[in-house]
């Protein structure tokens, strides 16, 4: 019975991480694309006075994030 070297143990640990790590990277990239589309919708919902709590329930976007996105969209729209 041979013992594994620290390098072999690290390589095995890295190999175990790779599939789920790659899946996570892909999901985050997809989320970035979705956020590009949802940001103006959330900004409009804020402008229409949809409660932040409801926005969070529907989108899982935190209230502070919704506020920041709405502010950024308003500034972009006003040309500031």
Swiss-Prot record:
- One MF term in GO for this entry? DNA binding
The UniProt keywords, alphabetically, are: DNA-binding, Plasmid, Repressor, Transcription, Transcription regulation
Q: Where does the source fall among the domains of life?
A: Bacteria
Instruction: Tell me which residues form the DNA-binding region.
Output: 13-32, 56-75
**Known function:** Repressor for the transcription of certain pIJ101 promoters, including those the from kilA and kilB loci.
Put simply, this protein is called: Protein KorB
Q: Which gene encodes it?
A: korB
